[in-house]
Amino acid sequence: MPDMNDYHGEFKPDFKFADLSKEALVKLIETYQRIFQGLCVVSVQVAQEQRGKDAGQQQFNEIYARTMTRFAIPLIRQALDIHDDDVISMFKYFQVAPDGCRGGGMYDFDFAVTNSNDVSYTGKYCQNASFYEKHGDADGMNRLCAMGPGSFEHSAYEAICAAFNPNMKMEWPVLPPRADRSAPFCRWRFWIDERDRSGGPA
């Protein structure tokens, strides 16, 4: 039987993901990513409505961090055999995460790899940041990423870095708001000092 490009035909009681074509699987995975993003958006909205903006944001940040460290990171690392603790391995995870940077047109990133333990990315497009920019929502942008420490993105990256390597460091030389619409939304760098890997003096 040929691979299924869609599921508009008859119901298959013995359906398996392996029955789908590569194109259909990619489309389904990207749809799952959008569903995960939607779950995150609704979760933070409900938390803020019920607990207030600050407490709700803090609660959601903690829920997301625990979900990544308890489920997403270990399960994806196991599924794709990503076992190293260097920065480039974390970027491999970023590419295939439930809200990953390669799927469905949600993000457009450029990567700069100095070595396996020094990697930067430039965010040319971000669906969430673009939404806040379009609606002039400075508070939403700050809570997402623009205020740096305390924002959702900063909290998430702290948790993900720690899950891969407690010695990993990060900096964020560019954050919103953008000077103009042709500028990147953000730029982040992640690295591990060689002395930290070798156990040498700081």
Where are these regions (language model features)?
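N-terminal accessory segment detector
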Residues: 1-120, 125-152, 156-158, 162-185, ...
